[in-house]
């Protein structure tokens, strides 16, 4: 079971909601290529609020992701796309339903 995760909340600038969604969709291939990233989800919470949730088997995978292409692109586009800085939290997973 993965024990490490990141939960991020992103608030799109007014009129940038579609661009944020497309940006997140464009990150999927990078997430797939990250060996240490077990799961990666991008989702919409509300009209202008988006989220990312990803999991890692170990600290090394988490750190590789935080220093990887998605994180770099996210912060490079932050001022253009987001109303406020992305809210990123490291999360400890202590229980989960196994994937079948």
Regions found by a protein language model. Give the residues of each.
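Short hydrophobic/aromatic beta-strand micro-patches
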Residues: 9-11, 53-55
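Short, surface-exposed ligand-recognition loops at beta-strand->loop->(often short) alpha-helix junctions
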Residues: 10-21
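Short coil/turn motifs at secondary-structure junctions
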Residues: 13-15, 45, 57-59
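Intrinsically disordered, low-complexity acidic/polar segments
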Residues: 17-19, 61, 97-100
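An amphipathic, aromatic/His-enriched active-site/gating alpha helix that lines ligand/cofactor pockets
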Residues: 26-39, 55-89
């Amino acid at each position: 079971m993965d024990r490490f995760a990141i939960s991020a909340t992103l608030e799109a600038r007014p009129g940038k909601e579609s661009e944020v969604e497309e940006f997140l969709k464009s990150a999927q291939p990078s997430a797939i290529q990250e060996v240490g990233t077990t799961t990666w989800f991008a989702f919409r919470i509300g009209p202008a609020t988006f989220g990312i949730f990803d999991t890692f088997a170990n600290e090394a995978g988490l750190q590789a992701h935080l220093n990887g292409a998605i994180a770099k692109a996210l912060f490079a586009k932050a001022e253009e796309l987001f109303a406020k800085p992305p809210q990123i939290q490291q999360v400890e997973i202590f229980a989960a339903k196994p994937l079948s």
